[in-house]
Each structure stands twice: as C-alpha cells, then as structure tokens.
C-alpha cells in the first residue's frame, strides 16, 4: 500500500461519497446495474464499520429519462420540473438497493440558504449526526425544484465540500467519469498523464483541471479541484476516482492507488472558520496594505482600520467580507464589526481615532481574528508545510 494512502485510510471512520450524474447514467438514462454495484460497495463499507454519507446527483437526469426527453433542458422551470419527477424515482432506487443489505436511507434536500444561516446549519449537522448514529445512509442532493441562482450551490461538488465540513468527514471520495486529475486535458492531449498525488493545490494544479463540464452534469474537473481545495483546507483528504470502475470503492479502502489523492493541509481551518470562508457569500471587499497582509497571514492578527486602503460594496455590520491585497488577490474572509460607510470614514486611521470620527467605538477591530478565516496561506507557511 502507498505510504500516503495508508496514512490517510488508517484514520478514516466517516466517509463522504459524492457520485456525479455522469457515473449514474448511461445511454438510456439511469444505469440501474451500476447504481446497485455502487450501493453494494457502500453497504459493504457500512458493514465493515464505516459511517457512509452520500451526495448524489441524478435527479434531473432521472426525470428526463422518465419523461422520454433526450435533448438538453434549457429553462430553469423545465429543469426544476424534471428534478421534481426524478428525485422521487432516484430515492426509490437507492432505498430498494440499500434495502437488499438491510440498510435504510434518509433523504436531505438543501439549498445554499440552508447552510448560510448558522442556526439551520447546526440543525442540519444534528440531523446528519443522528442519522449516522442510527446507521442510516444519509443521501443528500441540492433541492433543484426550488433553487435559483441566489441560493444554488453551483454544483454538487461544491455541495459535497460543504457537507464534508458539516459532518466532519475523515475522507471525501468524488466518483466521476474520469480516472482522476491529469496534468493536461486528456481529451485534447495524448501525452496527458494521471496525477496520483497532490500535496498542495497550486496554480499549476488548478490550471491542469479542465474547465469543461460533463454532458449530463454541471461540474467539470475544475469544479472538483476547487472542491478539493475547500475540503483539504478543513484538514480532510480528498480523492477523485473513476466511478465506473468495478469495485472502485472497495479497492480504495483496500489501499489500491486509484484516482488522485489530495492531501489535507497541515494548518487547517476550524469548522466555524470553514463556514465563514467557504459557505457564506461575500457582501463586499476590503483592500488591505502589506502590513495588514503580514499581520493576518503570518501572525494571525485581527484587521484594524489602519491597514485598509479600499472598500467595495454596501455591507452592514456582521456581513461576510473578503479581504484582498493591492493586486486583488483574495487573502481572507471575515465578519465585519462596522458597516461599509463607516469603514470608508475610518480606513487608514489608528484605532484611537474611531470614536472621534464616528462618534462611537463599538470595537477596536474591523474584523476580529476569531471571525477571520485565512483562505490563502503565506509563502512561509506553505514552505513549512
């Protein structure tokens, strides 16, 4: 067994498995034989003592097949109607398939707004925790029938990354239609080589990911690598693996080197800071100077008004805001203690002048370090890791 894989697998108790539409479907709609084979493997893992949580695509594809639609659906109402028809059928298939192994399933449909609200986020965590305690296979999907752009996850790769944080998974496996991440697009280059191990998601790794989505899903390799970036930032290893390969899940847990393994960051975010960084949508931007950049990235300090050189947006107190350097590179995201109009008045000033300018001083910091999540490590930290 590869040393990195052995180290990863020996600590795994709870695994999140994401299955894409391209894996679940064939030429004639849902591939029932493949679904049963995947379920057989997940059931085997469950009986071995692993806690298995699923994020599944396939509702729209299932609905299209039920209706005999072979062309792409273009309008949102059409996609939502197809999802309404297909989701029930998809769950029935999963329920029957897991039932053959004496296992029950529980359905959870989510939109982004369910996770950005901290109370609902924690309620979802409690529900999933209870399902796992009861030995129920939680099956999660985006609620396509009601989701609009403002509350969509974008794709289920992103949804899976967020669920990994909620359940505090020990491993995420993303089953896709390709063998893993290549150093270049294999569809256009004969010299493309599979990358078996990624220690850090660099710009070169991001560039290697294809921008193209699949014919039946919304997420391409770029989406999967971005999800890997989020998951590994929380300290969770991430594997992109060929979902159509026989016994792929069992082979992974037996230590076989399948797909691409992304190692977790050594210095990772807490659950709450992960929620701030990757679940909340930014309401504005604060541009900061070199001194503030160093204080945040290398010293773990709060953001003070003296380090701010620019403000974008019309946010209010408590909103999530992205901190960028002078070149516009995102560095951190945090919850602000002052509104955008107030920050414009006090940016560049010392803390001692806040009350003089605003007439009040509720906080010394624009963003306290407890509410500030670093999303880009300093070069010193990367080299140390």
From Swiss-Prot:
| Domain annotation PUA: ranges | 283-361
Task: Identify the residues that bind substrate.
Answer: 57, 144, 156
InterPro entries recorded for this chain? AceGlu_kinase-like_sf, Asp/Glu/Uridylate_kinase, G5K_ProB, Glu/AcGlu_kinase, Glu_5kinase, Glu_5kinase/COase_Synthase, Glutamate_5-kinase_CS, PUA
Name of this chain's protein? Glutamate 5-kinase
Give GO BP annotations, semicolon-separated.
L-proline biosynthetic process
Copy the pathway line from the protein's UniProt record: Amino-acid biosynthesis; L-proline biosynthesis; L-glutamate 5-semialdehyde from L-glutamate: step 1/2
State if Ribonucleoprotein is listed as a keyword.
Answer: no
What gene is behind this protein? proB
What EC number(s) are associated with this protein in UniProt?
Answer: 2.7.2.11
The Swiss-Prot or TrEMBL record describes its family as follows: Belongs to the glutamate 5-kinase family.
Which species does this protein come from? Syntrophus aciditrophicus (strain SB)
Q: Where in the cell is it found?
A: Cytoplasm
Could you name the Gene Ontology cellular component terms for this entry?
A: cytosol
Q: What residues does ATP bind to?
A: 18, 218-224
